[in-house]
Every structure is written in structure tokens, then in C-alpha cells.
A protein has these predicted regions:
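Conserved P-loop NTPase motor "coupling/switch" region that bridges the ATPase
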Residues: 1-67, 179, 226-229
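SF2 helicase motor core recognition
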Residues: 16-18, 143-145, 182-206, 210-227
Length: 296
């Protein structure tokens, strides 16, 4: 197919690494792509910004949607109960990465879950303020447990097995539901391509490995048509992988923000890869072993 003009429009020109953006530019302007091919380190950011200026123009949401209400984000730090701590330490020492990430949700009885307790409080607060809630998690088992915990407050959950048509039906039901109603969604499925402005509270059950995944999930509620301030709560547990994941992501996000606001891609990945998370688990193993006097 031939065309006189070619335009790419995306909210995520770069998600993991600078080469992704170079690949897009190569289609638009091969000459510019060849110039920036080697500019993949932070020291080259100024040159990169200047080189891509003819083909890359970034407009942030707040630049064009000045009427949007405030977005208020909060970290909800929870202290582990004894049973939570035992379950978490078992997951870490057995190098069960998924279970370690599901800290607080991986207990048998959610009455022992500090995150579940805080979630219930947030839902009650939302109802008292005439708000509705979206709860996101990466894990299907967490989705199942949250749905059981909240019972009749929930609509049907959204996950990868739900068809696009059925997803929209669930959202339509949620839009008509009273304050205090909760939509529970798997973040990969419900976090993109959906408009859920009837909710003004977003709860993230665990930190994700990519900031872009969380940002897109939040944007289901915080988008054109939203009339209320949107409250975002991140449920986190102290002295766990939650702390280390957040610390790592925040440092990467700061680098990205410093450059992306000037229409330049940060030359470092924002994503926590398997190797990085493996190092986080190793640090936790060492900490737990030291706690019990095991130096092996």
C-alpha cells in the first residue's frame, strides 16, 4: 500500500527500551533512525532529543485536557501479620516469585491479610463519599479472592477469558450500579481500551513491573469525561518485595520523566526484568536468613 503521508499516534512510543522508538522512527524517517541508532545511553539524551525533533512531538494529557480534575495518588503501607509474614517468607525462601509478589493475598484466610483489611476500609470510604471503585491485580487468584471478599459489592470480574463484548456489558452494569460498587479486573485485560469514568477510586493490589501498565490502568477512570478527583491507592507491604519494586520503579520513572517531558525517550528501560527481580528475591533471602541467624 502506498501513501503520501504517514503518521503514527501512540501514548507509548517507548515502553521498555529506546530501540522500540527507533524502530518506529525507522519507518517514518530511515535517515534519522540511522543517526540515532547508537544513542542508547543517558549521556546521549540531548543529542537524541535534537535528532528526533523533526519526527517526534509529545503532548501530555494535562497539556490538552486542562479541564480534568485532580489525580491524587497514595501509597498505603501495610504491616504484615504473623501469618502473612510466615507465608511471605516461605514464598521467598522457596524462590516462588509469583507467591512473593502476591504478598498478603497469598494467605489462606483473608482475615489475616493486611491488604484485604485496608481494601475493605477504602471501599467503605468510597461508598460514604458516593464513589465507585476499580480494583486491579495482575494475578487471577488475587482477583478471585478479592471478588469473594467483597461479595455483593462486586460486579462480575474482568479477566483475559472475558470477551470484549461481555467486558463492555460488565462496564455498562457497573456504570448503572450505586455508590460503593466495585469492579475487579485483571490489569492486563481491564487496564487498556476501556472507559470507566463512573469510577473515581482506583486500587492497585500490588506494584507492577512496568509503570506504563499502572498508568494505563489508572487512565481507565482518569480520562476525558471524568468529573471528580480520581483517588489512586497502591496497596503495599513493608519489608517485602513491594518496597524494593517500588524503589526500583521510582528511580526509573524519575529518569524517564526528566527526558520524556522534553519529547525525548529515556535511554534506560522502565521495566523490572526477571534478572532484576531475581536480585530482589536474593536480597530478601539474605535478609530473612539473617533474621533467623542462618548465615548459609
Amino acid at each position: 500500500m502506498h501513501a503520501e503521508r504517514l503518521l503514527f499516534m501512540t501514548g507509548t512510543a517507548l515502553e521498555n527500551k529506546v530501540e522500540e522508538m527507533i524502530s518506529l522512527i525507522r519507518i517514518l524517517q530511515p535517515r534519522i533512525a540511522s543517526q540515532i541508532q547508537g544513542m542508547v545511553f543517558m549521556s546521549a539524551a540531548p543529542q537524541f532529543r535534537k535528532a528526533v525533533a523533526p519526527v517526534y512531538y509529545r503532548r501530555k494529557r494535562e497539556d490538552v485536557l486542562t479541564e480534568l480534575p485532580d489525580l491524587i495518588e497514595s501509597k498505603e503501607w501495610c504491616s504484615l501479620s504473623h501469618n502473612e509474614e510466615l507465608a511471605y517468607e516461605h514464598a521467598v525462601l522457596s524462590k516462588n516469585y509469583a507467591e512473593a509478589r502476591r504478598v498478603s493475598w497469598n494467605v489462606d484466610d483473608l482475615r489475616d491479610s493486611s491488604k484485604a483489611s485496608r481494601l475493605l476500609e477504602l471501599v467503605e470510604e468510597a461508598e460514604s463519599e458516593d464513589r465507585k471503585v476499580i480494583v486491579f491485580s495482575f494475578f487471577l487468584d488475587t482477583i478471585r479472592k478479592v471478588t469473594m471478599l467483597l461479595g455483593k459489592r462486586c460486579t462480575n470480574p474482568i479477566n483475559g477469558a472475558v470477551t470484549p463484548q461481555r467486558r463492555q456489558e460488565i462496564i455498562d452494569e457497573f456504570d448503572k450500579a450505586p455508590a460503593g460498587t466495585v469492579l475487579v479486573a485483571q490489569i492486563q485485560s481491564g487496564g487498556t481500551g476501556l472507559n470507566i469514568q463512573s469510577a473515581s477510586v482506583v486500587v492497585l493490589c500490588e506494584p507492577q513491573f512496568k509503570p506504563s501498565i499502572e498508568n494505563q490502568a489508572i487512565s481507565r477512570a482518569y480520562r476525558m469525561g471524568q468529573t471528580r478527583n480520581v483517588l489512586v491507592y497502591r496497596l503495599l507491604c513493608e519489608d517485602t518485595v513491594d518496597e524494593k519494586i517500588m524503589s526500583t520503579l521510582e528511580s526509573k520513572q524519575a529518569i524517564f520523566d526528566a527526558f520524556a517531558d522534553k519529547s525525548v525517550a529515556a535511554a534506560e528501560s522502565q521495566e523490572i526484568d526477571d534478572r532484576t527481580f531475581g536480585n530482589i528475591i536474593k536480597e530478601e533471602i539474605d535478609r530473612i536468613n539473617a533474621k533467623y541467624g542462618n548465615t548459609k
